[in-house]
């Protein structure tokens, strides 16, 4: 896996970075989408900060394909998802994105669909 990290967001201290992200969003992108992805990052970061549910971490883009990842940190993946899901669902780029929420050693993974499912 080859990639690069775009931006290291850090609006809160070390929330739970020692144990890794509690939520990851895997999405497809094309290089022409980067400005829209950066705008989406700003919306996510603002909403997470305003709600006080954690922080948006780094965004990763794989150089050998069109895979992108948002990493999010905080104490409760469910509260975090409640805050970010309307923003993710509003973006066509996030249609069919895969969300993984971590609960300690257990994970829950599902796909974002436009039109209300998950």
Q: For each of these PLM feature ranges, what is it?
A:
Residues 90-106:
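Conserved short beta-strand edge segments in small beta-sheet-based binding/regulatory domains
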Residues 52-83, 87:
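Short, intrinsically disordered low-complexity segments
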Residues 106-118:
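Short, low-order "capping/linker" segments at domain edges
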Residues 2-6, 10-32:
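Short, extreme N-terminal segment that most often corresponds to the first beta-strand
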Residues 25-55:
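Surface-exposed, low-hydrophobicity interaction/linker segments
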Residues 31-36, 78-81, 106-109:
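Short, surface-exposed beta-strand/loop "edge" segments at domain boundaries and coil↔beta transitions
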Residues 40-44, 83-89:
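Short amphipathic alpha-helices in soluble, non-transmembrane regions
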Residues 70-72, 104-108:
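Short, conserved secondary-structure transition motifs
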